[in-house]
């Protein structure tokens, strides 16, 4: 342990390929070894990594409370990054047919084709035409489900802070790394 380092670090070893694939274990794109870009499996929150991370964070909060000294806890929730895999109950919060399409689904003039096809989503199975309205609704549905899923996981950690009596003396910072195009300018990614 380096004095300026972490006392504890948690990540599941060598799980990148498993994370990229679906709960069902289907790998469909042989070039990238990635499964579908979205999945609505009827599984508990802990079937996916963000649910496991929330549970781990709560265990760590309990442990750190007992230490009775200042602590730092970073939780790197992954959602809403691809793949848009979330438990079915979060997909069920939204009706796909009621999800609006982007109002500006046109391509910008002069956009080179290689830019249009550079999106990460093409690495996943079943992705051929991101301009299709049904596809864009499916992508938005998955994005909404993943937002609700990660919101629930963050809520569990915040609830634990309250239950443990730590909330009043804890600073919580939420950061995001980027947004998404969900059909705007005929682009998904």
Identify the meaning behind each predicted range:
Residues 1:
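His/Cys-centered metal/cofactor-coordination and adjacent catalytic loops
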Residues 9-55, 59-70, 74-189:
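Active-site-proximal cap/lid insertion segments
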